[in-house]
Amino acid sequence: MNLVPTVIEQSSQGERAYDIYSRLLKDRIIMVSGEVNDDMANAIIAQLLFLDAQDSEKDIYMYINSPGGSVSAGLAIYDTMNFVNADVQTIVMGMAASMASVLATAGTKGKRFALPNSEIMIHQPLGGAQGQSTEIQIAAEHILKTRKLINQILADGSGQDIETINKDTERDNFMTAQQAVDYGLIDGIMKNKKKIK
């Protein structure tokens, strides 16, 4: 069951009820939570485009708590983060794994954060194939191209060289918030809205 809380705001014109995500959107906050899939990507992309059209001079705040998911859906979000004119501040809370780690790193440099007890996990893309040998070969070539692309994005975002990224994504590589800062995936640890370590 997916329960979405409602908040009530009072103004001179009366009361207005919002679902919590709509209320957060008013403050330019986007929540990336759960598995990255096409439906989630479409919702995140629409919110990014809406907030950028509303005011491209103000930051967009993207809070991330996700195990990752679809590479194509994640890349659609990644491309939109880079497409919009507004700076996108990323804040990891809980976990940013797999494709979600790419999104955390894709925030505007200098504005990529994690809460103190967050984890970031990078690894190579996962995939499977079945069918005739030619289909399996095509799928294998595609996943190798995808790995090369994702690793280049991580290298560009972190400042690590591609050989280091290739080695470090060979297996699941879990990092604390501080390790992710040291690695270059994020820029700081956010203790609260005002205190950044």
UniProtKB/Swiss-Prot annotation:
Hydrolase among the record's keywords? yes
List cellular component terms (GO). cytoplasm; endopeptidase Clp complex
**Is the keyword Calcium assigned to this protein?**
no
Q: What SUPFAM superfamilies does this protein map onto?
A: ClpP/crotonase
Q: Which InterPro entries match?
A: ClpP, ClpP/crotonase-like_dom_sf, ClpP/TepA, ClpP_His_AS, ClpP_Ser_AS
Biological processes, Gene Ontology terms? protein quality control for misfolded or incompletely synthesized proteins
In this protein, the active site sits at S98, H123
What EC designation does it have? 3.4.21.92
Q: Which HAMAP family match?
A: ClpP
Explain the purpose of this protein.
Cleaves peptides in various proteins in a process that requires ATP hydrolysis. Has a chymotrypsin-like activity. Plays a major role in the degradation of misfolded proteins.
Q: How does it assemble?
A: Fourteen ClpP subunits assemble into 2 heptameric rings which stack back to back to give a disk-like structure with a central cavity, resembling the structure of eukaryotic proteasomes.
**What is the protein named?**
ATP-dependent Clp protease proteolytic subunit
Gene transcribed to yield this protein: clpP
